[in-house]
Regions:
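N-terminal amphipathic alpha-helix/helix-capping segment at the start of soluble metabolic enzymes
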Residues: 1-20, 27
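Glycine-rich, positively charged N-terminal anion/phosphate-binding segment
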Residues: 2-9, 31-40, 57-75
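Short, well-ordered coil/turn segments that N-cap beta-strands
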Residues: 13-17, 45-48, 73-77, 102-104, ...
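Active-site mouth loops of central-metabolism enzymes
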Residues: 17-33, 55, 77-89, 140-160
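Glycine-rich, proline-tolerant flexible connector loops at the mouths of alpha/beta enzymes
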Residues: 22-28, 46-64, 112-121
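Alpha-helix-loop-beta-strand connector modules within alpha/beta enzyme cores
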Residues: 57-82, 123-143
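Glycine-rich anion/phosphate-binding loops
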Residues: 83-100, 120-124
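Conserved anion-binding
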Residues: 105-158
């Protein structure tokens, strides 16, 4: 179910939307710990569970695997996808994997610049990633913002 529908339904029913966020382990061997945590979180009937994208792209491929586990537990997943360390080919691969696993909600983010790693140039901002994903038409997108003005913006007007 698309997140916008979850929020609409909750509003109509006067309910609060409960969600959790998990992150992929730094090592693949730790994934069982995440699965155990998901089993416990699912018992609390959250509307969705957000799955972050590996910091600096590390173990990022586990995002889809963990999001699929969330879905198998009967909870809607929200998969994070960052762009600063990805090119079009890697983003397309992630999107194909999300789609094959039935994941339809993506939180599109720029991601952190990793010291000593040159950012990819295909998507400089989350808005570039959103436009690319939206053109596919397969996913519902969520985004983040900096209400206090993004650190790289000259001022509020430029940021908006």
């Amino acid at each position: 179910m698309k997140l916008s529908n979850l929020y609409t339904k909750a509003k109509e029913e006067g309910k609060t939307v409960l969600s959790f966020e998990v992150f992929p382990p730094k090592k693949t061997s730790g994934i069982e710990t995440v699965y155990k945590a998901l089993d416990e979180l699912a018992k609390m009937n959250p509307a969705y569970i957000s799955v972050t994208y590996g910091a600096g792209g590390t173990e990022a491929n586990n995002t889809a695997i963990i999001a699929e586990k969330v879905k198998l537990l009967g909870v809607e997943p929200l998969a994070h996808l960052t762009c600063v360390n990805n090119d079009r080919v890697s983003v397309e691969k992630e999107l194909d994997e999300f789609k094959s696993k039935g994941i339809e909600n993506i939180l599109a983010l720029r991601g952190d610049i990793v010291p000593g790693v040159e950012p990819k140039k295909d998507f400089l901002h989350a808005s570039d990633l959103c436009s690319y994903i939206k053109a596919r038409g397969d996913f519902e997108l969520a985004g983040a913002c900096y209400p206090e003005v993004h650190m790289e913006a000259k001022d509020m007007v430029e940021d908006i």
